[in-house]
């Protein structure tokens, strides 16, 4: 009799156990739209690149990718929006030289730590910038511009809208022994409008964003900040031809909040690598004159660390003080 009671209890226990709820498996990532926050305005290299890669991710995942431009404070506003977002892989930051390298040495009491607050999921671009002037500008080359600046100290101006566009002219000024006046802008479009209108004298814009202005003849390049001439514009001399060793190139990448699960981080890295392997993206980047360095996940942090050290030296030589 005792054995029957035990058996009956065991059977009832098994039946009861069958109704214990089993935790549902998490939905496959991504199961809804992904937002890429670009911490600068439309038309810049970050915006252009984010849209190209976002389109490829859409095709790969069958989920929408929304590009959200949040300019201001040299990229800090958009960067902070991602720092405080849910670490679930659905809010991604387009990182730049400004947000993850130069701001560390140029912004006092920076509200985020590029290392502790973010996990980099891809570093994928390196390029120089063109020194641009109006087509009708009197200077036909860099030497002519420098001669004019020496003849009228403090009279020639350059526009800038982030650290990447401010550092090259400041750096050049130090090396050439000239004095230029900087004019700050909120976004690249405003600076370009004023350059075309003759309100400022020159502007340094990375090769991606410069492309449209070169193709339509609105602006003319005097030089490029790569160590050598760009394959896309072999007629444009490198600044290094006048000042040996001059090289200022930047990077782009993507990052998520640091608490994002590692499996999602790995998937995002894979999406980025697949996007950059596509023939369409490669073709477009060749048109922009870009030099690509697709970094695997293990090397991302090291690349950003090296860039941070490099830009700390750039800004030191340029004499740009923290603000």
Question: What does each model-identified segment do?
Answer:
Residues 21-23:
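N-terminal signal peptide c-region/cleavage motif recognized by signal peptidases
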Residues 31-33, 175, 215, 262-323:
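An extracytoplasmic/periplasmic, membrane-proximal ligand-sensing/linker region
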Residues 2-18:
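N-terminal secretory signal peptides and thylakoid transit peptides that target proteins
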Residues 34-36, 43, 50, 67, ...:
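Residue-level signal for nonpolar/aromatic packing positions in well-ordered secondary structure
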Residues 98-109, 166, 170-175, 202-234:
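A ligand-binding cleft/hinge motif common to bilobed small-molecule-binding domains
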Residues 26-115, 155, 164-165, 178-201, ...:
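N-terminal (or domain-start) structured segment
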Residues 126, 210-276, 306-309:
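C-terminal lobe and pocket-closing loops
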Residues 84-90, 105-190, 239, 251-284:
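Hinge/capping helix and adjacent helix->loop/strand transition within the periplasmic-binding protein
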């Amino acid at each position: 009799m005792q054995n029957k009671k035990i058996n009956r209890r065991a059977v009832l226990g098994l039946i009861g156990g069958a109704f214990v709820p089993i935790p549902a498996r998490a939905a496959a990532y991504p199961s809804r739209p992904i937002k890429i926050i670009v911490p600068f305005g439309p038309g810049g290299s970050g915006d252009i690149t984010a849209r190209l890669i976002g389109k490829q991710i859409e095709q790969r995942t069958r989920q929408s990718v929304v590009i959200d431009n949040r300019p201001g404070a040299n990229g800090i506003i958009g960067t902070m929006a991602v720092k405080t977002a849910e670490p679930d892989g659905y809010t991604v930051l387009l990182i730049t030289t400004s947000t993850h390298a130069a701001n560390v040495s140029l912004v006092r009491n920076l509200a985020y730590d590029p290392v502790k607050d973010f996990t980099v999921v891809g570093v994928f671009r390196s390029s120089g910038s063109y020194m641009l002037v109006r087509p009708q500008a009197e200077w036909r080359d860099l030497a002519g511009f420098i001669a004019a600046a020496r003849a009228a100290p403090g009279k020639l101006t350059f526009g800038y809208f982030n650290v990447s566009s401010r550092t090259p002219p400041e750096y050049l000024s130090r090396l050439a022994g000239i004095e230029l006046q900087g004019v700050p802008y909120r976004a690249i479009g405003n600076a370009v409008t004023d350059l075309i209108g003759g309100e400022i004298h020159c502007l340094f814009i990375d090769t991606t964003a410069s492309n449209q202005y070169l193709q339509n003849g609105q602006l003319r390049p005097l030089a490029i900040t790569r160590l050598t001439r760009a394959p896309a514009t072999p007629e444009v001399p490198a600044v290094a031809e006048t000042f040996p060793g001059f090289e200022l190139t930047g990077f782009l990448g993507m990052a998520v909040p640091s608490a994002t699960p590692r499996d999602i981080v790995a998937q995002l890295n894979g999406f980025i690598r697949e996007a950059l392997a596509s023939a369409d993206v490669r073709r477009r980047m060749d048109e922009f004159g870009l030099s690509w360095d697709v970094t695997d996940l293990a090397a991302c942090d090291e690349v950003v660390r090296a860039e941070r050290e490099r830009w700390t030296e750039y800004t030191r030589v340029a004499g740009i003080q923290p603000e």
